[in-house]
Curated annotation (Swiss-Prot):
Further details from the record: During catalysis, the active site Cys acts as a nucleophile attacking the alpha-carbonyl group of tRNA-bound glutamate with the formation of a thioester intermediate between enzyme and glutamate, and the concomitant release of tRNA(Glu). The thioester intermediate is finally reduced by direct hydride transfer from NADPH, to form the product GSA.
Name recorded for this polypeptide: Glutamyl-tRNA reductase
Organism of origin: Synechococcus sp. (strain JA-2-3B'a(2-13))
Site feature location: Important for activity: H99
Name of the gene this protein is made from: hemA
Residues that bind substrate: T49, C50, N51, R52, S109, E114, G115, Q116, Q120
Keywords: Chlorophyll biosynthesis, NADP, Oxidoreductase, Porphyrin biosynthesis
Amino acid sequence: MFIAVVGLSHRTAPVEIRERLSIAEAEVGETIQQLRTHPHIEEAAILSTCNRLEVYIVTSEMESGVRQTMQFLAELKGIPLPQLRPHLFTLLYQDAVTHLMRVAAGLDSLVLGEGQILSQVKKAQQLGQACNGMDRILNRLFKAAITAGKRVRTETEIGTGAMSISSAAVELALQEQGSLSQGKVTVVGAGRMARLLVQHLLAKGAVDITVVNRSLERAEALAKQFEQPIQVLPWESLLNSVAESNLVFTSTGATQPILNYQQLAGVLQPDQPLLLVDISVPRNIDPDVEKLKGVQVFNVDHLSRIVEENRAQRQKLALAAEALVEEEVDQFMEWWRSLETVPTISSLRHKVESIREQEMEKALSRLGKDFAEKHLEVIDALTRGIVNKILHDPMVQLRAKRDIEARRAAMRILQELFNLDPVVFQAQQER
């Protein structure tokens, strides 16, 4: 079996492409099940965030599995593969393993060291498990990646004071406007990103903040988390609130734009200054809004200027994090390499155990019933101990071989010397 990841991220694709390939949380399970109907796709998991869509697969045929995954993504979203392929990346074997662990550790994020990605990796594992998309290998891989992410956050300082998408968005608005204490700010959405937006806005001096959300109850719950007064409005008041604001942030899970040129043209004054910062993928603000005079629109791809300033300061901290990730990669790879040896080791142990039982039965029959009953446990433990000690070193050495060809050569020798057929043995065990 082989591990691969096919995907795109803020490094390979602009937001216009990322939003087209975005997969909503409610659609992940069904999407994985569809992918697993393809030949050669044994396991699958999907990590979908505002800055990346990554499909992790375990495949019996590497080339076919990767090709099928690429074609599946193109057909899923109705994007011709030749148009999509330049934005996709593919990583195989250990490179795929290392990539997921770096992602979970925040080392591949737009904002270096940001913490939200770890919870998103955990969610990807939960969704993959819920639809039976993940089995032994991907479960182990995601568990190892989550461990790597946790270690990086607890054993290094890369997460201390790290920016988030939300804090970078507020910083960008502050640089554009000079001050956040004047005028009204509207935050559209009431999820985690919206909560962080409000938190950072208050920290940067904003005093007149309104939260608008489809669920008024969720918006009220968000507002109650802060001591400062936060106004809450129902969804029907969205356009009025935007028209009264000089700064608007959007952070919702909507799959279509919630603000467009026609809507805003109907409520804004001619040349009314308005700064819109959209941190959602798919985008909440239609690109045609930029045609309005006086209106500035920023999306997640515009945060790079802010992020790079923060990244340069944090690059030294990343070195220690990379070392921890490498340790977790080595541990996973050692386990993964050992999987190939399991059928050979199991068939060898089964054969030797059968011989032990047969020979012990012969010996006990010659020793007589009374002796056998009296000393059965001792003789059984003795022979079992001898067998285990004889097999111990060969098994350890076989599992420990890092070179693939050397390990396979050793397995072939064992199979030939002991007349083993691991494939037949495994089939018998599965009956």
